[in-house]
Amino acid sequence: MASKPFKRSSVHWVDLDPTRRRELKKTRPALIVSQDALNEALDTVVICPLTSTLHPTWRTRLQIGLNHNQSEIAIDQIRVVSKDRLTPRKIGDLSPKEQAALRDLLSEAYAQ
């Protein structure tokens, strides 16, 4: 498969269906969190879906502004998806400040 230019910290539309139980579903924006070297080498990427339903007290969500809209990165819904599920054209990027906050949140949730 030809490598698509999916980069860490970029946001793309992703088709998450079919899903089960409480997984976030439908076609929605998702943030790529996997390393660029893996994104180039594999046919899959690691993503965190975005949602417009805000949960300010949830410690597994990071609120961001994307294209003048408030969204949350749902790190509790992190998953691996085929690149075929993503649109190649990105719809946004995290700011350096948001990237740092996301790294801290991911580390707190999964590395400690």
Question: Predicted segments — roles?
Answer:
Residues 1-112:
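Conserved functional hotspots at enzyme active or ligand-binding sites that engage polyanionic ligands
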